[in-house]
């Protein structure tokens, strides 16, 4: 049986480079690349996409839509790392752990849209609680997240790493118009009736995300406790290879969250911090924006689509 072929369209961007690095040396697939002079040639790109078993799109949204339009071969399967198709009903959302059986849905999908980095953490925290009836669909969700500057893409990396480090701003809060492009994605896949309030920021470090969601217990169904929220998440992710829920007893000793703690991995760590006296809970997610938030998730989805679970586990 011949090896499946994988073509990365946009393999010189931040995510594309990391996916290429993760796949380099794999003996269970053939990684197709174009010469430098042909990487932006639409004719050669279209040929490579249509000749691949799976094409991974690491492109800006408009270019990703264009690349999908190149497809004439009905056998080609696609993983899109852009945000172009994340709310489209005919694309499978590429977060394997978000629902029971969803990994199998991805495994058999023709079109998979890779989650955004921030939505990965927000949906991981909110969706299981909403599905269990512990978090009302109309809860006024507020999300804050800090990412390493690599979340801004190649231009942001160059700006931080090629200039005078002393001029780098320690923290840049953005999305102040409350219209970040990830909001519809979070709302849809977390099962929320209303748009969540989302305030992101970039820190003066390369990669890693810490995302938090404050919860007022008085706004939840009567009798719901922080312990129940934790139990729900712990149960949902009990068998997940790449998502871990910190034991409730351990959170009492945690005084800070390090956004860089899981850098270089495809893992995500969730936490539930409970203040029963004040009726408040803080949900948290820590993960690598370039790992579980991008390239790691894409490779995880690729392995599911290839039926290469053993290879994924070994990696």
From Swiss-Prot:
Catalyzes the NADPH-dependent reduction of N-acetyl-5-glutamyl phosphate to yield N-acetyl-L-glutamate 5-semialdehyde. This is N-acetyl-gamma-glutamyl-phosphate reductase. Pathway: Amino-acid biosynthesis; L-arginine biosynthesis; N(2)-acetyl-L-ornithine from L-glutamate: step 3/4. InterPro entries: AGPR_type-2 (IPR010136), NAD(P)-bd_dom_sf (IPR036291), NAGSA_dehydrogenase (IPR050085), Semialdehyde_DH_NAD-bd (IPR000534). It is found in: Cytoplasm. GO terms for molecular function: N-acetyl-gamma-glutamyl-phosphate reductase activity; NAD binding. It comes from Burkholderia lata (strain ATCC 17760 / DSM 23089 / LMG 22485 / NCIMB 9086 / R18194 / 383). The gene is argC. One of its GO terms (biological process) is L-arginine biosynthetic process.
């Amino acid at each position: 049986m011949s090896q499946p072929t994988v073509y990365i369209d946009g393999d010189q961007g931040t995510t594309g480079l990391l996916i290429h690095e993760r796949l380099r040396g794999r003996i269970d697939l053939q990684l197709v690349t174009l010469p430098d002079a042909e990487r932006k040639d639409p004719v050669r790109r279209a040929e490579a996409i249509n000749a691949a078993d799976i094409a991974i799109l690491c492109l800006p949204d408009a270019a990703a839509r264009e690349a999908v339009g190149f497809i004439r071969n009905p056998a080609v399967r696609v993983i899109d790392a852009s945000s172009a198709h994340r709310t489209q009903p005919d694309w499978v959302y590429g977060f394997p752990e978000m629902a029971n059986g969803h990994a199998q849905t991805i495994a058999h999908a023709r079109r998979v849209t890779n989650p955004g980095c921030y939505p990965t953490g927000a949906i991981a925290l909110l969706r299981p609680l909403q599905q269990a009836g512990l978090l009302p669909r109309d809860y006024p969700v507020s999300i804050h997240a800090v990412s390493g500057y690599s979340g801004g893409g190649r231009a942001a990396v160059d700006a931080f790493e090629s200039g005078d480090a002393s001029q780098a701003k320690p923290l840049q809060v953005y999305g102040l118009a409350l219209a970040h492009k990830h909001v519809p994605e979070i709302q849809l896949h977390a099962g929320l009736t209303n748009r969540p309030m989302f305030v992101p920021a970039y820190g003066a470090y390369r990669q890693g995300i810490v995302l938090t969601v404050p919860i007022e217990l008085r706004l939840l169904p009567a009798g719901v406790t922080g312990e129940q929220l934790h139990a729900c998440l712990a149960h949902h992710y009990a068998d997940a290879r790449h998502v871990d829920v910190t034991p409730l007893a351990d959170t009492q000793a945690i005084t800070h969250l390090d956004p860089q703690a899981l850098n270089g991995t495809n893992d995500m760590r969730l936490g539930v911090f409970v203040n029963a006296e004040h009726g408040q809970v803080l949900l948290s997610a820590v993960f690598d924006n370039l790992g579980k938030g991008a390239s790691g998730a894409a490779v995880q989805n690729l392995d599911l689509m290839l039926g290469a679970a053993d290879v994924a586990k070994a990696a």
